Regions:
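Eukaryotic charged/polar low-complexity linker/IDR segments
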Residues: 130-132
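Short, solvent-exposed loop/turn elements at beta->coil junctions and helix N-caps
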Residues: 108-110, 176-177
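A short coil-to-beta-strand element that immediately follows conserved catalytic motifs
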Residues: 97-108
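Conserved short histidine dyad/triad with adjacent acidic residue
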Residues: 109-124
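Short catalytic/ligand-binding loop motif for oxyanion handling, primarily in non-cytosolic enzymes
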Residues: 38-41, 66, 103, 116-119, ...
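Non-heme Fe(II)/2-oxoglutarate
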Residues: 2-97
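Residue-level marker for the onset of beta-strands and adjacent loop->beta junctions
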Residues: 17, 105, 116-118, 150
Length: 192
């Protein structure tokens, strides 16, 4: 069952956090304290309990991404609740990215398992904006961006991550592989 109070408090929390961010950036915004503690705890419990993770495919839908699984949509649970929260804050995302009429395309939960890593790449510009928030992570698993000639490390802590303007095409990667006996969980949202 959907928790409307959680959605309301989560939307207010995230709107407040986003309102505090500057629009003076070049397409990369590092974020912290994205969701309430209650939402992060609920996301982590959901990820740990889920047994129906699906293979993550590459952008061309032809190749399975090694050691990454996803959950793309679930009704009446934290997946739908976070989708609704992110839908509610889309005007703030538009303001930050300086683009009108972005539409939330969806929310994925990612489960990265032993050996997962990704080489330098840019995201598909069909997805204009993306957000990634770490639900469970390690200090060595920080996404690195090549941003204006500088290497920028995201904060790898739980409930931190980034918002990226994918039309700019900022190269990024995960240099260290997920170690044995650890699952890295994150939430990834896209707007077009």
């Amino acid at each position: 069952m959907i928790d409307q109070d959680l959605i309301k408090s989560g939307s207010m929390h995230l709107k407040s956090m986003l309102a505090s961010l500057s629009i003076d950036h070049n397409g990369l915004i590092l974020i912290e304290d994205v969701f309430t503690d209650q939402i992060i705890e609920k996301l982590l419990k959901f990820c740990i309990a889920a047994d129906d993770w699906e293979p993550q495919l590459t952008a061309d839908n032809k190749t399975i991404v090694a050691n990454r699984k996803k959950i793309a949509w679930r009704y009446d649970c934290i997946v739908e609740e976070t989708h609704t929260i992110l839908e509610n804050v889309t005007p703030e995302i538009c303001r930050l990215i300086k683009r009108d009429n972005l539409v939330l395309g969806g929310v994925n939960l990612w489960k990265d398992t032993e050996g997962y890593t990704i080489k330098p790449h840019t995201d598909n510009p069909v997805i204009q904006t993306s957000l990634q928030v770490y639900i469970q992570n390690l200090p060595t698993l920080s996404t690195i961006f090549d941003y204006d000639g500088n290497l920028v490390h995201t904060n790898p802590n739980t409930n931190a991550g980034y918002i990226s303007d994918n039309l700019i095409g900022i190269p990024h990667w995960l240099p260290n592989a997920v170690p044995a006996e650890f699952n890295r969980y994150s939430l990834h949202a896209i707007w077009s």
